[in-house]
């Protein structure tokens, strides 16, 4: 099956060619790589088409390009051109991504389309694929399109095409989503997959090898956005004063420079910045505790941190703010915080470290549920069911 994966992927070439600090998504790109890699291993031909959007406005045109450092030799990645001028940026990104999708389809027709979230380029391409190309579309739903990151519904105005996005939810033929809340927004009749995260072979192997050499580390990994709670975590760690333990911080984003200043000359905090995948796996498997101090959401399940699954698979105990209901087996390896206020974070860290709660993990369950073999079977089943559903519905909307 030839698959177009239309997603805001950000590979090495894009990060070098365009200023994307403000909209960088590290975990999202990792998950896209995992999905595309598994589908390729199952003999599907996958192409990633990314808008490569630049949100920092400037009068500069960025030409389309192909990723020169692909994560997989059989998964080509194409980026649309960008023109980040006020009032034009979004329309340009949408139009150029759409034209790139049409061009790739004309050269070699696709059999199925996967879209990642409901940004304008994804909505436009999916609508065209359904109405004009008679192709089934699988919706990968990671972030609730109808509320903001804090779960407030006042953000409905940011849904890219208004009612068209809502209509698209009733037009797709399959869905994989990060939470039951997100899946509930789709029609009950279509094939669905609860897909919280994924565990790669690299993480599985390192986790097994390093199970007995855990260090007194607390690890934060992720994009440095205000909503991630990293500033509160650093403030809490300074107040905690836990001898023999270190806080390790990886990632990159708009707060990176501020965070570097905050941790300067603090021997209890190790700031790694943006690291390679190999180094990140080593850090995750070395830490006894990993932490996800996200801002509290008013709509539980509107997002789910992919890294929680990786943390647990690495054999770490996870401290997190609530992100919607989870399976009991997963929660066995977690400690919840009611919010990410520094005092709350301090209390949670004391509970986990001094009470040795860090010994309680959910490693094996997560590997069994979200390891490569399990996810590969579930993905393949979803694609088969989606194709069958599309045919059974007799949909045909070719222009």
Question: Which residues are covered by each model-predicted region?
Answer:
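A short, well-ordered alpha-helix in the C-terminal region of glycosyltransferases
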Residues: 356-369
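Nucleotide-activated donor-binding/catalytic signature segment of Leloir-type glycosyltransferases, i.e.
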Residues: 258-282, 289
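N-terminal subdomain of nucleotide-sugar transferases
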Residues: 1-63, 174, 232-241
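A short, active-site helix/loop in glycosyltransferases that binds the activated sugar's phosphate group
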Residues: 52, 59-61, 148, 158-194, ...
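Membrane-proximal helix-turn-helix segments that form the acceptor-binding/catalytic region
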Residues: 33-37, 102, 121-124, 128-132, ...
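Nucleotide-sugar-dependent
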Residues: 226-228, 278-282, 288-310, 320-328
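Conserved donor-binding/catalytic core segment of Leloir-type glycosyltransferases
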Residues: 4-6, 209-238, 248
């Amino acid at each position: 099956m030839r698959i177009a994966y239309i997603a805001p992927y950000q590979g090495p070439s894009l990060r070098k060619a365009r200023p994307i600090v403000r909209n960088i998504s590290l975990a999202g790109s990792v998950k896209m790589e995992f999905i595309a890699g598994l589908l390729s291993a199952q003999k599907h031909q996958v192409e990633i088409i990314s808008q490569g959007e630049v949100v920092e406005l400037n009068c500069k045109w960025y030409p389309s390009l192909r990723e020169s450092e692909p994560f997989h030799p059989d998964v080509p990645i194409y980026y649309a051109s960008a023109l980040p001028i006020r009032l034009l940026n979004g329309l340009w990104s949408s139009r150029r991504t759409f034209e790139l999708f049409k061009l790739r389809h004309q050269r070699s027709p696709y059999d199925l389309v996967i879209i990642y979230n409901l940004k304008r380029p994804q909505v436009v391409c999916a609508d065209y694929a359904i109405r004009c190309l008679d192709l089934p579309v699988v919706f990968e739903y990671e972030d609730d399109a109808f509320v903001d990151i804090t779960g407030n519904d006042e953000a409905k105005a940011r849904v890219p095409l208004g009612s068209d996005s809502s209509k698209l939810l009733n037009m797709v033929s399959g869905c994989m989503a990060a939470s039951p809340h997100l899946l509930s927004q789709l029609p009950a009749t279509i094939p669905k997959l609860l897909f919280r995260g994924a565990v790669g072979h690299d993480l599985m192997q390192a986790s097994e090898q390093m199970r007995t050499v855990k260090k007194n580390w607390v690890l934060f990994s992720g994009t440095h956005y205000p909503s991630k709670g990293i500033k509160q975590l650093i403030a809490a760690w300074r107040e905690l004063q836990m001898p023999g333990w270190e806080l390790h911080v990886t990632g990159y984003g708009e707060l990176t420079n501020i965070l570097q200043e905050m941790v300067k000359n603090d021997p209890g905090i190790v700031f790694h910045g943006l690291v390679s995948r190999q180094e990140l796996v080593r850090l995750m498997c070395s830490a006894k505790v990993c932490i996800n101090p996200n801002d509290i959401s008013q709509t539980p399940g509107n997002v789910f941190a992919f890294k929680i699954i990786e943390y647990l698979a690495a054999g770490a105990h996870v401290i997190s703010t609530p992100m919607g209901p989870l399976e009991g087996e997963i929660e066995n390896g977690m400690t919840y915080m009611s919010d990410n206020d520094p005092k709350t974070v301090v209390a949670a860290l004391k509970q986990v470290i001094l009470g040795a709660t860090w010994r309680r993990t959910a490693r094996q369950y997560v590997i069994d549920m979200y390891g490569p073999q399990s996810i590969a079977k579930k993905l393949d089943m979803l694609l088969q069911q989606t194709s069958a559903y599309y045919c059974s519905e007799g949909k045909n909307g070719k222009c």
